[in-house]
């Protein structure tokens, strides 16, 4: 047995150790054969011989298990070395990912308004008629509803056509002052070179008690915002109509492609329409129970901004997943 103990101590791997175990405790092992011969002995001799065999087996098992544990730990350490990650290795064939141009544009817009202490508010994509239309001064008989082709589930539920319902939900849940933006996906039944059935908007709302908010405040914020997004551009406000603001305006910037000189993109006017805005209509305040307040609202299409920032001619290409296009925005 001493010979086997010495062999165990010299073992350098688990396979050799297992071979020793089989030679001792296997079906034809030395100790196994010894236990088999017990039946040939008389009672007293059997008892004495069995005690010796068990003692040797115990000594062997103790040496075997100790060595097995050591070799198993060494094998584990070796596997860990082989499997370890080399954090200094760089495979140039693997490229890093990048934000989609719509998401990077959305992030830039949000970043600006967060710096002005605007909160980010969210609402459901599936809306009801009250929040999406009626509370925004668009009753069922209002002709302005024809301006939007809507995805209806039934008479009461629809896919929101704008993020303006988030403004209504926020005003119903909070008291003034409110400074918020509502970024998110919206849906309209439209699909062409400048429209897709799903797109993204960022709408903003500011409401203060009393008559503290004026169109001049709105104009100042939007002019600074547009120059933050597009650089040194000219900004103009044109009178327009929106059911939920009065007065209302469309906002244009000097064409970022031709620097205002006139080109095919701006239809040779030198101007590009980028967003709508206005002073919140008093009728909207009636729906949310506000009194003696003033405020302004604005809304913009994120895809429109992304197209202008990255000079993308077809809006639909933003949603086709073409890697040749997306790789340009790394």
Curated annotation (Swiss-Prot):
Name the CDD domains for this protein.
PheRS_alpha_core
The cofactors it requires, by name, are: Mg(2+)
Primary localization = cytoplasm
- In short, the EC number is 6.1.1.20
Specify the domain of life of the species encoding this protein: Bacteria
Q: Which GO terms describe its cellular component?
A: cytoplasm
| Record keywords, A-Z | Aminoacyl-tRNA synthetase, ATP-binding, Cytoplasm, Ligase, Magnesium, Metal-binding, Nucleotide-binding, Protein biosynthesis
> What biological-process terms (Gene Ontology) are attached?
phenylalanyl-tRNA aminoacylation
Q: Where in the cell is it found?
A: Cytoplasm
Q: What Gene Ontology terms describe what this protein does at the molecular function level?
A: ATP binding; magnesium ion binding; phenylalanine-tRNA ligase activity; tRNA binding
User: Which InterPro entries does this entry report, sorted A to Z?
Assistant: aa-tRNA-synth_II, aa-tRNA-synth_II/BPL/LPL, Phe-tRNA-synth_IIc_asu, Phe-tRNA_ligase_II_N, Phe_tRNA_ligase_alpha1_bac, Phenylalanyl-tRNA_Synthase, tRNA-bd_arm
Q: How is the cofactor bound?
A: Binds 2 magnesium ions per tetramer.
* Residues binding Mg(2+): 246
Q: Does the keyword Glycoprotein apply?
A: no
Q: What's the catalysed reaction?
A: tRNA(Phe) + L-phenylalanine + ATP = L-phenylalanyl-tRNA(Phe) + AMP + diphosphate + H(+)
Q: Which family does it belong to?
A: Belongs to the class-II aminoacyl-tRNA synthetase family. Phe-tRNA synthetase alpha subunit type 1 subfamily.
List the protein's name.
Phenylalanine--tRNA ligase alpha subunit
UniProt organism field: Campylobacter jejuni subsp. jejuni serotype O:2 (strain ATCC 700819 / NCTC 11168)
């Amino acid at each position: 047995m001493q010979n086997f103990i010495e062999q165990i101590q010299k073992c350098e791997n688990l396979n050799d150790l297992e071979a020793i175990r089989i030679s001792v405790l296997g079906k034809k092992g030395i100790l196994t054969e010894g236990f088999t011969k017990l039946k040939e002995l008389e009672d007293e001799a059997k008892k004495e011989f069995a005690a010796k065999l068990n003692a040797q087996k115990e000594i062997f098992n103790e040496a075997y298990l100790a060595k097995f544990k050591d070799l198993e730990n060494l094998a584990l350490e070796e596997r860990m070395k082989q499997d370890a990650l080399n954090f200094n290795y760089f495979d140039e064939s693997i490229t890093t990912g990048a934000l989609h141009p719509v998401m990077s544009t959305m992030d830039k817009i949000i970043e600006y308004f967060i710096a002005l202490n605007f909160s980010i508010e969210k609402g459901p994509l599936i809306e009801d008629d009250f929040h999406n239309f009626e509370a925004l001064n668009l009753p069922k008989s209002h002709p302005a509803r024809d301006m939007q082709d809507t995805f209806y589930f039934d008479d009461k539920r629809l896919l929101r056509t704008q993020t303006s319902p988030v403004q209504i939900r926020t005003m119903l849940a909070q008291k003034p002052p409110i400074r918020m933006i509502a970024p998110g996906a919206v849906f309209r039944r439209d699909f062409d070179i400048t429209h897709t059935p799903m797109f993204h908007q960022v709408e903003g709302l500011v409401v203060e008690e009393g008559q503290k908010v004026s169109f001049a405040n709105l104009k100042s914020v939007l002019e600074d915002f547009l120059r933050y997004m597009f650089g040194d551009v000219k900004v103009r406000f044109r009178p327009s109509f929106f059911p939920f603001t009065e007065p209302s305006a469309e906002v244009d910037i000097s064409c970022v492609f031709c620097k205002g000189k006139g080109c095919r993109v701006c239809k040779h006017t030198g101007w590009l329409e980028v967003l709508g805005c206005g002073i919140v209509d008093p009728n909207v305040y009636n729906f949310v129970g506000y009194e003696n307040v003033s405020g302004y609202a604005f809304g913009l299409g994120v895809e429109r901004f992304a197209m202008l920032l990255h000079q993308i001619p077809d809006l639909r290409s933003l949603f086709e997943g073409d890697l040749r296009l997306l790789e340009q925005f790394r």
